[in-house]
């Protein structure tokens, strides 16, 4: 089996939750952090590990920001293969890549620009030695409540993890899992959920606090401090 690794960054969303009222409608992944677009930070974090042979960024057709955002980065290409959902975008990027089924694929959120090199190395090391692959994740530390405007119940946090990215799986397995999820109407919020639905148990690899997903307006200020 091959140890070849590529990365896919789905970057076709608009990030509505991260917008301030009245702020220019620049997609979240292109908003500046520490002087550079957030997407550029996310891609550069993947390029920090030389084992990643290429980073493929999937954008929406007509994207007018990506050329400038990623100009000059090595081992990086971008294609207008973004779909209606994250799963569609990743599936489209996989199909467009043409990689062999046994190639390892890292899928990383454009909104996680704080990925530390040691966490990425941990994930790659662990997955190369595993039959399935896995993801970065953090054990839940806070008390977890279920409810809407009022608490309905408190959940047992024992054994609960917060999924992060990258998530790393063989291209063929991931492609088949995403296809099966689409056919069967399985809700896929990350690649691991598709892999789980296909009957596999992905490896949980300790992530990092600074690898949080920039989601809300205040997250930009916090991430600036990390970067």
Model-derived regions: residue spans:
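N-terminal glycine-rich phosphate-binding loop and ensuing alpha1 helix
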Residues: 2-64
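Short, conserved active-site loop motifs that form the nucleotide-linked donor/cofactor pocket
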Residues: 5, 76-78, 160
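Residue-level signal for inorganic ion chemistry
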Residues: 9, 39, 93, 108-109, ...
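Acidic helix N-cap motif at the loop->helix transition within catalytic regions
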Residues: 64-70
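Short phosphate-binding loop-to-helix
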Residues: 71-104
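Conserved core of the sugar-phosphate nucleotidyltransferase
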Residues: 101, 114-203
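Catalytic beta-strand/loop signature of glycosyltransferases that borders the donor
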Residues: 203-210
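Phosphate-binding loop/pocket of nucleotide- and phosphate-handling active sites
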Residues: 214-227
């Amino acid at each position: 089996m091959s140890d070849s690794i590529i990365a896919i960054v789905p970057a076709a969303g608009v990030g509505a939750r991260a917008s301030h009222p009245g702020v220019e409608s620049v997609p979240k992944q292109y908003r500046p952090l520490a002087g550079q677009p957030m997407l550029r930070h996310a891609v550069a974090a993947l390029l920090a590990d030389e084992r990643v042979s290429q980073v493929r960024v999937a954008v929406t057709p007509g994207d007018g920001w990506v050329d400038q955002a990623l100009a000059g980065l090595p081992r990086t290409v971008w294609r207008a293969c973004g779909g209606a959902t994250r799963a569609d975008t990743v599936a489209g990027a996989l199909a467009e890549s043409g990689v062999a089924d046994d190639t390892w694929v890292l899928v990383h959120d454009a909104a996680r620009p704080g990925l530390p090199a040691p966490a990425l190395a941990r994930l790659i090391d662990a997955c190369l030695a595993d039959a399935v692959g896995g993801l970065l994740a953090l054990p839940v530390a806070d008390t977890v409540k279920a409810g809407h405007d009022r608490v309905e119940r408190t959940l047992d946090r024992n054994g609960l993890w917060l999924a992060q990215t990258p998530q790393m799986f063989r291209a063929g397995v991931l492609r088949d899992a995403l296809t099966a999820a689409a056919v069967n109407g399985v809700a896929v919020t990350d690649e691991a959920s598709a892999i789980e639905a296909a009957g596999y148990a992905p490896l949980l690899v300790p992530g990092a606090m600074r690898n949080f997903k920039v989601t809300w307006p205040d997250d930009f200020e916090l991430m600036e401090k990390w970067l």
